[in-house]
Swiss-Prot record:
GO terms, molecular function: 1-deoxy-D-xylulose-5-phosphate reductoisomerase activity; manganese ion binding; NADPH binding
Organism: Paraburkholderia xenovorans (strain LB400)
Protein name from the UniProt record: 1-deoxy-D-xylulose 5-phosphate reductoisomerase
Taxonomic lineage from the root: Bacteria, Pseudomonadati, Pseudomonadota, Betaproteobacteria, Burkholderiales
Gene Ontology BP, a term: isopentenyl diphosphate biosynthetic process, methylerythritol 4-phosphate pathway involved in terpenoid biosynthetic process
Binding-site positions, NADPH: 11-14, 38-39, 125, 127, 208
Length: 401
């Protein structure tokens, strides 16, 4: 039976890759709803090609522009806007599958709505689990939702684990691989001078600006450790990170008997997306077959926590529990936004996050309101910390120590 998709974040890199796979298999997939924040022109192009019933944007002005262009083109897609509209298309009876690809905390509410509606969820928005892990996983279990990871690392782990949960007891640990980003071998003393353009040039993957910066600081890998904790019900001590510059092995599972299973493939997000879309079937993703002879060699190294303090901060937040991970994520979003707008330097990102974690009290996350309050408090604290920095010193590491 054809799957009906709501694609949250359709104009981003994950959205592009998802629609590429969907277009290859029109007999399997159709689009119920697409969403974008403010990239109305690209959303119009997608609507004209895939003819969704609903398109969601971030604000009324963008909605009016998109609706006018669609009417002019004779497209009948309904255009709505705002956070509630995202929730509506995520829990609608018009779809059975929700691809959650909105970057950041903005993706939490619609992803949670999809879980509570019992949808099949393809999760690319790691923040939903980072912020509200127990709450989100409870919603999935209590409402019969199906959760399939789209992040390449978590999708790799999913493929390497036994299908039956009862057999997961044989798992010794999971190993998330990381490319090390664009600054893996750069002299640490020069990192204070990194520009947004340099940070956004990932050596292997095509990604959006925010996640590219997170990869450069390795905060992205830290968030993935937290996500893996909730997805696979393993403590942080049994989740390792391994630098693998070629990005060919996407992650590994180590078993009690000494076996290690790994998932390999070319670094292209269409592979995990196609796997999750068609699961348990396999379909063509458009990705070239892996040629190991051409690659010739694969290398590995341990992460340098001095070079990548954000990775250590994420591990610390996971160990502390409560709302610490939500605060970590919120502070990082504010810090990365400030870096991209050239308000602070690259090395200041970790310092801002560290300052927020050390300032805000941690507490239990019993309900979504607890998470949202921690998120808001961390954003305020991060913004206030950045604002207190002298203008001439914001781009130095020393200014935020």
């Amino acid at each position: 039976m054809q799957k009906r998709l709501t694609l949250l974040g359709s104009t981003g890199s994950i959205g592009d890759s998802t629609l590429d796979v969907v277009a290859r298999h029109p007999e399997r997939f159709s689009v119920y709803a697409l969403s974008a924040h403010r990239n109305g022109d690209k959303l119009v192009e997608q609507c004209l090609r895939f003819e969704p019933e609903v398109a969601v944007v971030g604000d009324a002005d963008t909605a009016a522009r998109v609706a006018a262009k669609l009417r002019e083109a004779g497209c009948k897609t309904e255009v709505t806007y705002g956070p509630q509209a995202l929730v509506d298309v995520s829990e609608s009876d018009g779809c059975d599958t929700v691809v959650a690809a909105i970057v950041g905390a903005a993706g939490l509410a619609p992803s949670l709505a999809a879980a509570r509606a019992g949808k099949r969820i393809l999760l690319a928005n790691k923040e939903a689990l980072v912020m509200s892990g127990a709450i989100f996983m409870d919603a999935v279990r209590d409402n019969g939702a199906v959760l399939l990871p789209v992040d390449s690392e978590h999708n790799a782990i999913f493929q390497c684990l036994p299908r039956e949960a009862a057999l997961h007891g044989g798992v010794s640990k999971i190993i998330l691989t990381a490319s090390g980003g664009p600054f893996r071998t750069r002299e640490p003393a020069t990192l204070v001078d990194v520009t947004p353009e340099e940070a956004c040039k990932h050596p292997n993957w095509v990604m959006g600006r925010k996640i590219s910066v997170d990869s450069a600081t390795m905060m992205n890998k830290g968030l993935e450790v937290i996500e893996a904790h909730w997805l696979f019900d393993l403590p942080g001590e049994r989740i390792d990170v391994l630098i693998h510059p070629q990005s060919v092995i996407h992650s590994l599972v180590s078993y009690a008997d000494g076996s290690v299973l790994a998932q390999l493939g070319n670094p292209d997000m269409r592979t995990p997306i196609a796997h999750a879309l068609a699961f348990p079937d396999r379909v063509d993703s458009g990705v070239a077959q892996l040629d190991l002879a051409q690659i010739a060699s694969l290398s590995f190294e341990k992460p340098d926590y001095a070079r990548f303090p954000c990775l250590a901060l994420a591990m610390k937040a996971l160990a502390e529990g409560g709302v610490a991970s939500a605060a970590l994520n919120a502070a990082n979003e504010i810090a990365v936004e400030a870096f991209l707008s050239r308000q602070i330097g690259f090395m200041a990102i970790a310092q801002v996050v560290d300052a927020v974690l050390n300032t805000l009290p941690n507490r239990s996350a019993h309900a979504l309101e607890d998470v949202l309050e921690a998120d808001a408090a961390a954003r305020r604290a991060a913004a206030e910390f950045i604002a207190r920095l002298p203008d001439g010193a914001r781009r130095t590491e020393r200014a935020v120590q």
